[in-house]
Amino acid sequence: MTLQQFADWLAATPPSHFLQDNEAWAIPVIQTVHIVGIGITMGSAFMLTLRVAGVSGMDQTLLDAQRRYLPWLTGALLLLLASGALLVVGEPAREFFSLSFRLKMLLVALCATIAGWFGRSVARRPAHWEERSRRDRKLRVIAATTLLLWIAIIFLGRFIAYDNVWGAWSPAAQQG
């Protein structure tokens, strides 16, 4: 099955028809939920980044900061997964053939992997990471880069609707 065939099949399913038939209210509701998830994700990622960088939150250990914000980050990512999946079901071809969508998914996977790795690493060796967060510039650069990646994800998500800015690079341009 090609990606186009899968998109056509998905667009013909009852959930997709429901979203297409009720797009005047369903899509804005789903997008609002998605935006709330983005806000929670960015807030959590920002606070953790500030703590790792030693800029804020130094009154708590790195492990405490992780315990405080990682559940919010995880929950928000699950919310984004659910709302994002519904947005894909509503317009599968638009999403699947969008360079912005593909790049966004790649960066989401990268950021989720980094967050998971870092979370497990801190939980296993909290003293090591606590000391390292106070003196290691590379760790600060990684934290800041991760935050910039989350911002890029937001940018790419918004640009799904304007994927033609990529011109011939976009798979959508090659489709049509």
Language model region names:
Residues 1-176:
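Polytopic transmembrane helical bundles with strong interfacial aromatic enrichment
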